[in-house]
Amino acid sequence: MRAPTTARCSGCIQRVRWRGFLPLVLAVLMGTSHAQRDSIGRYEPASRDANRLWHPVGSHPAAAAAKVYSLFREPDAPVPGLSPSEWNQPAQGNPGWLAEAEARRPPRTQQLRRVQPPVQTRRSHPRGQQQIAARAAPSVARLETPQRPAAARRGRLTGRNVCGGQCCPGWTTSNSTNHCIKPVCQPPCQNRGSCSRPQVCICRSGFRGARCEEVIPEEEFDPQNARPVPRRSVERAPGPHRSSEARGSLVTRIQPLVPPPSPPPSRRLSQPWPLQQHSGPSRTVRRYPATGANGQLMSNALPSGLELRDSSPQAAHVNHLSPPWGLNLTEKIKKIKVVFTPTICKQTCARGRCANSCEKGDTTTLYSQGGHGHDPKSGFRIYFCQIPCLNGGRCIGRDECWCPANSTGKFCHLPVPQPDREPAGRGSRHRTLLEGPLKQSTFTLPLSNQLASVNPSLVKVQIHHPPEASVQIHQVARVRGELDPVLEDNSVETRASHRPHGNLGHSPWASNSIPARAGEAPRPPPVLSRHYGLLGQCYLSTVNGQCANPLGSLTSQEDCCGSVGTFWGVTSCAPCPPRQEGPAFPVIENGQLECPQGYKRLNLSHCQDINECLTLGLCKDSECVNTRGSYLCTCRPGLMLDPSRSRCVSDKAVSMQQGLCYRSLGSGTCTLPLVHRITKQICCCSRVGKAWGSTCEQCPLPGTEAFREICPAGHGYTYSSSDIRLSMRKAEEEELASPLREQTEQSTAPPPGQAERQPLRAATATWIEAETLPDKGDSRAVQITTSAPHLPARVPGDATGRPAPSLPGQGIPESPAEEQVIPSSDVLVTHSPPDFDPCFAGASNICGPGTCVSLPNGYRCVCSPGYQLHPSQDYCTDDNECMRNPCEGRGRCVNSVGSYSCLCYPGYTLVTLGDTQECQDIDECEQPGVCSGGRCSNTEGSYHCECDRGYIMVRKGHCQDINECRHPGTCPDGRCVNSPGSYTCLACEEGYVGQSGSCVDVNECLTPGICTHGRCINMEGSFRCSCEPGYEVTPDKKGCRDVDECASRASCPTGLCLNTEGSFTCSACQSGYWVNEDGTACEDLDECAFPGVCPTGVCTNTVGSFSCKDCDQGYRPNPLGNRCEDVDECEGPQSSCRGGECKNTEGSYQCLCHQGFQLVNGTMCEDVNECVGEEHCAPHGECLNSLGSFFCLCAPGFASAEGGTRCQDVDECAATDPCPGGHCVNTEGSFSCLCETASFQPSPDSGECLDIDECEDREDPVCGAWRCENSPGSYRCILDCQPGFYVAPNGDCIDIDECANDTVCGNHGFCDNTDGSFRCLCDQGFETSPSGWECVDVNECELMMAVCGDALCENVEGSFLCLCASDLEEYDAEEGHCRPRVAGAQRIPEVRTEDQAPSLIRMECYSEHNGGPPCSQILGQNSTQAECCCTQGARWGKACAPCPSEDSVEFSQLCPSGQGYIPVEGAWTFGQTMYTDADECVLFGPALCQNGRCSNIVPGYICLCNPGYHYDASSRKCQDHNECQDLACENGECVNQEGSFHCLCNPPLTLDLSGQRCVNTTSSTEDFPDHDIHMDICWKKVTNDVCSQPLRGHHTTYTECCCQDGEAWSQQCALCPPRSSEVYAQLCNVARIEAERGAGIHFRPGYEYGPGLDDLPENLYGPDGAPFYNYLGPEDTAPEPPFSNPASQPGDNTPVLEPPLQPSELQPHYLASHSEPPASFEGLQAEECGILNGCENGRCVRVREGYTCDCFEGFQLDAPTLACVDVNECEDLNGPARLCAHGHCENTEGSYRCHCSPGYVAEPGPPHCAAKE
């Protein structure tokens, strides 16, 4: 630690120490990243957050601004006198620094204003006589005291430095106290010096002068005499860091060990030593990205002299490592885990083109224990270093550094005093390391994440690997213990090439150093973006205003916007900063460095290449190769880049081979070729071609791999080979040469004997150094230098021939030793001092693109192929091969870095011979088709044609055939045909004649007698004949011949045809035809015109015949239909003589009647009514006629006898005892009872003995005050209790505790038991119902008028809400009206976050799955814990935590209203959460009631299953009902199906119309039972098994009688089935209405309700006898009555309702309702609705005017009452057309039902009935 800055007194030194300590402590407490420094080094809050850190409780920010402490920090030097452990300690109990802090507090009256710091003027350097332009610092805000006397501001002062009540001259009051303890220096101290005493400045290190205005020149360290050698002084312009993430370091360069002689100032070369030594008390505050708990960047600090400078001259950055005292952070680390992936790249060259192919290996994990680890299988070795090795040192063990020759110490941080002081053994260790078979890559990475640590745990990892591999590190983590490996890792993407000296690659922790030129001031740090250091998403383009095409990895804003990106962002995308026309090279203008596209600022003077290949997604299907300022996508052999340069396509996609394209392909044959030859990709990618080429190659189908190979862009698009090849050639020339050559060098083994001197590679980073732009009017040239891994650029000399000064980073030491040039063009030998290895100690690429070979007296450069030594003979430069004319005038030579290429002229082709290229002549004469019709002679770059006879030379140099036929007279008597080189005369064809060398047509029609029986038509070269009717053209079409019409059957089809010349005749017509008048056809004969045809019918003529129809009665047409024959009426089962015997006659029949029948009209037997005229059944019966007979209907007390023809008395006393309690006496037609005791009396109606009820009301009760209970023949007296009491076994009346039933009084009150009764004490917002047995909600909106003012009042359960009509307003409870909503204000009252936050989290809700693992069945994906656990859920959340049980405290807290109720989001009243019924159908709709419909009830839900399903409570689904278990198929085999069943019948049985019975269709008796065939009497009433009140007028069938008004049928009095039975429903095709009415729940046919009817309660009636109509959910039970009598016995007269029948017994004999069940509606619950009845049969919705009802289907809104009333569809004239045809309509609640008439069945679809088949 250096000594503090000296001053004139010791006390001042002490104050300086505390003065430096105070602001640092406050900065640590306050956070230096939140502060900005003003022009004199003080800190001010950078935002309102900084002010908030200092605000006292309850103070206003404006008032607190005067309390902000002024901070002072020296970022480049540690605080004197303090250890790093004290930096984070809070300042406590020190009156010295506290008084100093109070002295620095600004007065309350200070004003914040902006001032300009003094502008530093140009001054002459004391040694270099160079002008340095001082830069003015940007304007900053600072606190400045107004110019008023201190006494006027503070009043009278006391204490020291006070003169006359005011501060003495040179002193002023401090900012925080009223004492004159602050010295005044005018003018103020510069360069951040401090004013210690009046007019006395204490300067910072590196500055001197009265006002610290002079920069102390740097000193060189001379190891010969161990004394500092002064260098040119360096000035540093003051300027505060405006970014909260300021980075910076003070870098001092050291000259070589042997100082050269001082040349004249104008000729001196400034060549800094590449290994940097940092001196001076500098400290760099840096920020490392970390993933802390809050996601913020951690602040870390490094001390002086602990910075590692990369040994590469191209890597102009400083790597900051951990300080020595930070080692305690990793002392306990015994094991380090390193995960990396090796990559091996090889270079293949073919046909003059080279390509890179890289193959990644397996991801390797090595553990470093004790400082190093080794994997013998993979050949990799890693070193883990806990100490930093500086000045080019390398870590070779856990706590050991290998130091170069010019440094020493544990960290290589001390310079070597003398050359002979180097410790022994180090050099040998270094040589052993280099001679090994492995190479090393070095990475400096953070080991773990720490919160605000000043000593970051950075580790330096060296990976030794085979030379052909490179390494990519994924993870570096610490392992705390062997048994419990707790990893603390940082994932990184660090790439490094194999460098033997451990140069750091793209380390994301490399800071921006500022290398200082000799004689030039260090430039201020760059102005960093507010996004500096953040990683975000980089976008390549936008689509419809939205960012699109994101890259695959996160990048910084500088890397994104400086390379390929247009938009960038962390949480949202923003356009990249506008980039002006960027320079082609880096320039510095107005103090800012501008980099070209593809580069980013490395520091104030260097631009570093952006490695775009580190960003995923640029080269989609290709390999990415980084180039200078850009990148390149390369492809594997057989592939090439498309025009987008980012995708590899097959070289078949740009094949230039041409062939025929066929538009049709069938049966392997190609047809319809195109005219021109085209390529295969144009043919097959254009949807035109089906096949291509000479072999008829079929085009590949779209979507196949073959199609994508030739059509990578899809249908309608092809690639241009010229574009692709030109771009590839350009890429090879400008971009591929250097990277590929460098990789070739790296993979090439060194020559024999040079293994110990391997070539030194440059760092992978590329940087460009820029000179400062001159001022306007300066005529000096701008000097720009670039440096790259393969080509370090040089600055040429000026016009006067002076050698240009070397630039920093070239790494060429300045040496007075002589140079010896070896006779070679690429070897330079330089003599150096003893013990000086320039190839190692210097930059790794001292020779540039060549190999540096150390010599005893210097070094030599062996240049790579394509390079030559620079004229200065000190490094390799590109060899311009084009100067030697390698293309020999046959093409254009294009030079490239390290190579060249020839662009051959037409007529020449490129030939590559090894490393050379040349253009050779193309022999066009060897190509087919050249000089056709002549002789070809090849020439240089072209060819020449000599034409044969018959050809002529054309302009293009080709031979063209002469067409001799163009000359008239060539062939006077024939036709001339041209041929290649000649012609031929041919004779004219038939029909033509020669004329002037051509053939003309002959008109044959001019010849007489041609075309007899026709007309001649002349044609070109021939003629044809058009014949008359009856003639046809001859085969040669030159004559006409007769047509034989008789050869076709169409002539005379019903007769004989005779052919004649030109015509024909018909004869011998068939029966029914005759010959017409012209004899050419046989016409039909009308037989009906002749008399006597069809005498007993009507004759109808037909073609060729006739038929007899409409025969007379008793006749019918015979099978031939040509006569009417007699009908035998006596044949067949249905004889016309019913009740008699039939006898057939001609045209009629005769009836012979049986007894009981009589003949009517001689044709039928009619029943004789014996009951007319004679009294056969008198006097005790009524005569009823029957078919062929009669029977007697006897009066009560009489029975039929003698076959039913007589009535006789019934002895009632003989059959049963009709007189219980008495004696029976038979009488005529009746009986009488003689009662035995006085407790019975005869009935006046029936005469039976009836019990006398002694307990009936009478004046003198038989039991007095006791309760009388009647019994047969007697009675008993029972002690009775008042209501609310029950009788105990001992006879006492005990009070009934109604409150023992928890359901009494509901959920909104509690029960208070009283004697004989109880009362309900209701909660707030509820009141007792009129019955006093429950608590009902109080409608505050109706009771309290205008309770919400002008807002809408909405009543909720237990309270009310005030809602504003507009969403832009909110209700103010204090003012009582709506006011505009404040921005950001919450509508619901603010409550504690910790109480409300869990209820807002929505996660998965699970149900218990029987037999399966937990959390295997998801109820809902987006449910709160209350919605899940208060309803049907069993587990909730990502952790699948079980829901609390209903009897737990957690459940009562989560679900205070009980099961089925959830809190209403946003609804608060009087500070309490409102709860409402949970609609499980909405929350868990898809998981509930599958194969059915879910219906919400309060509380719970119900499942309405589809037909064929029943509800399963365990799975909450509707399961298939196995109908086959219910004997569904009679006489057949039942097969169950999902939701239905099917009956399989065995032959000859078939399935009837019901689908449930197999019947025999061959037997008529099976199809038509007797009671459906015969007609008989229908009885309307049956009493005591006696049928009475017959239906008079007509007889009916059994079905008609029972389904209309009858109760029995036929003479046997067959009883009809009960109307509530299944037999009646099947017989009459109606639903069991009585069964529906008997149930407490109104069932809809075809659906099952609830958890199954077996689970319904036995008693669906309440205490008042009214049935409960609420539907039962899967977990609910029927509501218990408010109270019950425990002493009630099962035998009491308690109304009991039997469970209704199963739904399977209700189907399927009904016509379903027309309307479907109402769909699920979402609306307000009844308790939330502002309508009195809650919109029953509809849903309640809120509108602007209030509330209204949205009615379900089948209901309509009644406007006056706001109620949904049923629509009577049966009376609606506008309803369905012909509603319930063939049946009658019955209106139901919300729908209607059709009942089909007998003989009709229900049809699917529209509601109507169809006749049975």
From Swiss-Prot:
Forms part of the large latent transforming growth factor beta precursor complex; removal is essential for activation of complex. Interacts with SDC4. Interacts (via C-terminal domain) with FBN1 (via N-terminal domain) in a Ca(+2)-dependent manner. It comes from the Eukaryota. One of its GO terms (molecular function) is growth factor binding. Residues 94-115, 226-243 are annotated as: Heparin-binding. Disulfide bonds join C185-C195, C189-C201, C203-C212, C385-C395, C389-C401, C403-C412, C538-C560, C547-C573, C561-C576, C613-C624, C619-C633, C635-C648, C661-C683, C670-C696, C684-C699, C685-C711, C839-C852, C847-C861, C863-C876, C882-C893, C887-C902, C904-C919, C925-C936, C931-C945, C947-C959, C965-C976, C971-C985, C988-C999, C1005-C1016, C1011-C1025, C1027-C1040, C1046-C1057, C1052-C1066, C1069-C1082, C1088-C1099, C1094-C1108, C1111-C1124, C1130-C1142, C1137-C1151, C1153-C1165, C1171-C1183, C1177-C1192, C1194-C1207, C1213-C1224, C1219-C1233, C1235-C1249, C1255-C1268, C1263-C1277, C1281-C1293, C1299-C1311, C1305-C1320, C1322-C1335, C1341-C1353, C1348-C1362, C1364-C1378, C1405-C1428, C1415-C1440, C1429-C1443, C1430-C1455, C1481-C1494, C1489-C1503, C1505-C1518, C1524-C1534, C1529-C1543, C1545-C1558, C1578-C1601, C1587-C1613, C1602-C1616, C1603-C1628, C1729-C1740, C1735-C1749, C1751-C1764, C1770-C1785, C1780-C1794, C1796-C1809. The keyword Glycoprotein applies. Residues 181-213, 381-413, 609-649, 835-877, 878-920, 921-960, 961-1000, 1001-1041, 1042-1083, 1084-1125, 1126-1166, 1167-1208, 1209-1250, 1251-1294, 1295-1336, 1337-1379, 1477-1519, 1520-1559, 1725-1765, 1766-1810 form the EGF-like domain. This is Latent-transforming growth factor beta-binding protein 2. Its main location: secreted. Residues 1631-1813 are annotated as: C-terminal domain. Keywords: Disulfide bond, EGF-like domain, Extracellular matrix, Glycoprotein, Growth factor binding, Heparin-binding, Hydroxylation, Phosphoprotein, Repeat, Secreted, Signal. May play an integral structural role in elastic-fiber architectural organization and/or assembly. Gene3D superfamilies: Laminin, TGF-beta binding (TB) domain. Residues 536-588, 659-711, 1403-1455, 1576-1628 form the TB domain. Belongs to the LTBP family. GO terms for cellular component: collagen-containing extracellular matrix; extracellular region. Residues 257-266 have a biased composition (Pro residues). Residues 1-35 form the signal peptide. The lineage of its organism: Eukaryota, Metazoa, Chordata, Craniata, Vertebrata. The modification Phosphoserine is found at S491. Glycans are attached at N175, N328, N406, N603, N1161, N1301, N1422, N1560. The gene is Ltbp2. Residues 108-132, 293-302 have a biased composition (Polar residues). It is found in: Secreted, Extracellular space, Extracellular matrix. One of its GO terms (biological process) is supramolecular fiber organization.
